[in-house]
Amino acid sequence: MIDISTLFSLNKINEKLTPITYIGDVKHSRVFESGRQLLNLLGFKVGVFTDKNLLPENKNDLEIYESWDEVFESSNAIELLRVQKERLQDNEEINFDEYINNYQLTQEILGKSQSDLAVLHPMPINIGIEISKDAIEDRKIKYKDQLSHAIPSRIAAFKYARDEI
């Protein structure tokens, strides 16, 4: 809800592009699943770009991308998700060196993206895993915008649930 509110405030929701592509551990992420459900209710598919071992079992209404170039061609916003080591099962193996090499957002990768890309992150951020140290301060990183929507979004949902709005 907070992420969708942030996307609306940044004018990132439109019919031409996938509203957001999630990058990282979508298999174990509650942020991904709730965002996916809400965007699907609004009539949108969401994108994912991740290691095959971190894809969700249900791939319906997903756009699965194979490269950063595909992500940038199809989405005007991305959300980085941390690998949730504590939720990995014994049979789920992740090679972190390979993961970082393929899926870490770096300044070099950001330089290839569109100038108005919005990069979200639900926090906590693992600098050096899902995002490099040099990329964290880029103007495209919008986690502070997300934080500014957190309380107002929750208040609105609470008031709506109580029929106050």
What annotation goes with each model-predicted range?
Residues 7-9, 39-43, 98-100, 138-141, ...:
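Short, low-complexity, polar/charged sequence segments that are solvent-exposed and flexible
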Residues 58-134:
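Rossmann-like adenosine-cofactor binding region
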Residues 1-6:
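A glycine-rich, Thr/Ser-enriched phosphate-binding loop motif common to dinucleotide/cofactor-binding enzymes
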Residues 8-81:
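Glycine-rich phosphate/diphosphate-binding loop of Rossmann-like nucleotide-binding domains
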Residues 23, 27, 97-98, 145:
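Conserved short-loop catalytic and cofactor-binding motifs
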